[in-house]
Design a protein with these regions (language model features):
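Active-site-proximal beta-strand/loop segments in catalytic clefts of secreted hydrolases
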Residues: 1-4, 37-41, 65-70, 77-81, ...
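Subtilisin-like serine protease catalytic core
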Residues: 29-31, 58-61, 82-89, 132-145, ...
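Secreted peptidase-domain scaffold signal
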Residues: 39, 173-175, 180-229
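Long, low-complexity serine/threonine/glycine- and acidic-rich segments characteristic of extracellular
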Residues: 202-302
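Selective detector of the "anchor" transmembrane alpha-helix that sits immediately C-terminal
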Residues: 305-322
């Protein structure tokens, strides 16, 4: 979905409450995989380019797509988050600059166009291939695959005054690339390998505070005793790490893992999967959490949510001990 708009606007009402944003959420709730343009409103502003995600790209459930140049750098025009209700958008980034598109006004019927309206059809095409690989793919599975398997992109401040850091405390997703750069081949392979007889769940809550080297526990089902399968956990864009089987029968019904030390504090996402082989992988369990530098003692699960006061101010999130 794209409105074809390209102008600079600062938003205070891009909270997903507009009629068309709510309609896009309803489309996803009906089981239809949906991709939306982030918008082309970042412009060249030094600060105000943040919070320029346009409606309906601010809808919560669809995948909102940012645009990359041909060199895979983030396009200067591509709108950045946050939304005005402080959600992280976009969700993913793919190439949208200098794309050949139909144009009846030209001699050969084509012209070069740039915008998130060019990036979004590419992401929709990737989604179509994923559905071809797995006709039963759900919108939530689609989003979890993008979140877990996108190529990690580091935010880099360039000399260009229009490129600024809109993601003060975000690591994955961030408000410029989302979960990262689309990886079409991996997305399609993973979609085709989903085995719903395999399941995994982490014992953590959304936005739980997680200390350095915290222990994460969880449950899994679908593996027989002594099988070659395993539970794997990934923090942000790091590599998948194998958990420890804590079950009595060697079937991973109970598992744990002590997280590797993290370098970047702030909001990120922890992913878990039950892996049997390349053709049989469980749906992803994904949880947004808050990483802090304090080292966990006795491999505890992390601080209780009430031990920190989360203060929201504009696009900033401050963690204050209480």
């Amino acid at each position: 979905s794209s409105l074809g708009e390209q102008q600079f606007e600062i938003h205070v009402d891009n909270d997903g409450s507009s009629a068309w944003s709510r309609q896009m959420d309803a489309v996803v709730e009906a089981g239809i995989i949906t991709t939306l343009s982030a918008g082309n409103e970042f412009g060249g502003a030094t600060f105000a380019g943040c919070n320029t995600i346009d409606s309906p790209g601010d809808a919560a459930l669809p995948i909102t797509v940012a645009s990359l140049d041909k060199d895979l750098g983030l396009a200067i025009y591509s709108s950045r988050g946050y939304t005005s209700d402080l959600r992280v958008k976009p969700d993913v980034a793919t190439i949208g600059s200098s794309i050949m598109a139909p144009d009846a006004a030209t001699n050969d019927g084509y012209t070069s166009k740039s915008g998130t309206s060019m990036a979004t059809p590419l992401m929709a095409g990737i989604a179509a291939l994923m559905v071809q690989a797995n006709p039963d793919l759900t919108p939530s599975e689609f989003k979890d695959i993008i979140a877990a398997y996108s190529i990690e992109r580091e935010i880099v401040l360039l000399d260009d005054p229009g490129f600024n850091d809109c993601s003060v405390v975000e690591t994955r997703p961030d408000n410029e690339f989302g979960y990262g750069q689309a990886d079409p081949i991996v997305f399609v392979e993973v979609a085709g390998s989903i085995d719903r007889s395999l399941n995994v769940t982490m014992d953590i809550d959304t936005l739980q505070v997680i200390q350095n080297r915290s222990q994460i526990t969880g449950i899994a089902s679908g593996l027989s005793s002594g099988s070659e399968g395993r539970v794997e956990v990934r923090v942000g864009g790091a590599e998948w790490s194998e958990a420890k089987d804590e079950s009595n029968d060697g079937d991973w019904t109970s598992w744990s893992i002590v997280l590797e030390p993290h370098n970047n504090s702030g909001n990120t996402t922890i992913f878990a999967r039950l892996y049997l082989d390349d053709d049989h992988i469980s749906p992803i369990d994904a949880k947004r959490v808050i990483l802090i530098d304090e080292v966990a003692t006795n491999q505890e699960k992390g601080l209780n949510e009430e031990s920190l006061l989360i203060v929201l101010f504009g696009a900033l999130i401050f963690l204050v001990p209480v």
